[in-house]
Regions:
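Short hydrophobic alpha-helices and adjacent helix-cap/hinge residues
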Residues: 1-190
Length: 190
């Protein structure tokens, strides 16, 4: 008797359950692009780990409701426009890790950009001002040029007899060039 009631109940509920299941709309996956001007982002990269953790706290599941596309120029900055074009076809947001990448995304894509740079975003022209950045870009910058000069001053104080210091930088990266010029000016000061 119990088996018969269970079968009848199951058959009676089947149309209701299937209608409910089939009427659910699929959740659209969100696409985030990561653009590196240097080495590729790996799953162990701080930015990838942080993104996954942050999005998962908001209910996104990487691989289904959140897709992260990664591109890297591997120091070939002339490849950045091509990589941006590739990312912007799918991504709703692009996150960059350098001034060079942020500049190219800003100039070539009309989607939101989060720039994590070691350069002053106002001095490099990425944004108009900190209060009103304008455009499609936001992010984190730093006063690295001033810090470079201060670091050199501390170094000179620690080693007063030192006469030569070498500094490596990428002349194609305005942020790095600004840091170099600031350090160079500090080196000349007595």
């Amino acid at each position: 008797m119990i088996l018969r009631r269970s079968v009848i109940l199951a058959l009676g509920l089947t149309p209701l359950l299937t209608r409910k299941v089939f009427s659910q709309t699929a959740v659209k996956a969100r696409h985030v692009g990561l653009l590196s001007s240097g080495a590729p982002f790996t799953d162990a990269s701080d930015i990838v780990v942080g993104l996954k953790a942050g999005f998962s706290m908001r209910g996104y599941v990487v691989g289904s409701s959140l897709l992260i596309e990664r591109r890297a120029a591997e120091a070939y900055l002339d490849r950045l426009p091509e990589l941006v074009d590739d990312l912007k076809s799918e991504a709703e947001l692009i996150i960059t890790n350098s001034y060079a990448a942020a500049r190219v995304v800003k100039d070539h894509a009309n989607i939101p950009v989060v720039a994590i740079t070691g350069a002053d975003p106002v001095a490099t022209g990425l944004i108009v001002s900190l209060a009103h950045p304008g455009g499609n870009i936001t992010g984190v910058g730093e006063v690295a040029a001033e810090l470079s000069a201060k670091r050199l001053e501390v170094f000179k104080d620690a080693f007063p007899n030192l006469r030569k210091i070498a500094m490596l930088w990428n002349a194609d990266d305005l942020g790095m060039t600004m840091r170099y010029k600031s350090a160079e000016a500090a080196a000349i000061r007595p």
